[in-house]
């Protein structure tokens, strides 16, 4: 898996297609997707453009998607994957993740009441994981992993797993370093991938990591941009990073 990839969370509709094409032209070979993001069909159109033009071959790319919380029932896992494959226009994924260790009732994307959630005691993660393992057996997925899992959740999963998670994808940056989780994953041979490596989106006047005085000072000293400093920190500390942008100049700068 390439250590630097393109994140597509909150990529605006109508812009992500061109962003993916630009990223592939610039040299990105890792694209991170998820059914929840609602843009896999647009990403798929960009991938098909790239394949048909000869820009890249399928085997050159690493494509990740994620199982949403309302499809944890074992009988729902394969259909959810097939929908992502259909939208992306692919025959297989390189990596498929359980998006969160949380279960919603089927068809509920974002629960508004407790009754729309299902306790893990009623739908254990290990049952979902067995269905994920079956996707690898079938050749629909090369690797499987998790996202937003704590060390405790991974430990519990490992007690029942036939295949170990390849990746745990979590938010990680200098303001949320998660070093204990990083050390745990490294000990277990699990690659930690950092989403929001440039910090969470700021709003309501909250400070931005990109404006952090220490980050800005390091950037100035090394004649780099704050995003370049943050991505270098993530890579140097052992994580893969998947920054998101739909702007070609920023995509180039992040490489």
Q: How should each PLM-predicted stretch be described?
A:
Residues 11-24, 73-88, 125-127, 152-156, ...:
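Short, acidic/polar
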Residues 49-59, 88-90, 135-140, 160-164:
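Short helix-capping segments at alpha-helix termini
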Residues 30, 92-95, 143, 167:
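Residues at the N-termini of beta-strands
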Residues 57-71, 95-101, 169-172:
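A short, structured active-site edge motif that brings together acidic residues
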Residues 2-15, 66-75, 116-123:
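Active-site mouth loops of central-metabolism enzymes
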Residues 1-61, 78, 131, 198-202:
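N-terminal binding-site loop/beta-alpha segment at the start of enzyme catalytic domains
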Residues 69, 101-255:
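Beta/alpha (TIM)-barrel catalytic core signal, keyed to glycine-rich beta->alpha loops juxtaposed to Asp/Glu
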Residues 77-98, 134-138:
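CE4/NodB-like, metal-dependent polysaccharide N-deacetylase domain
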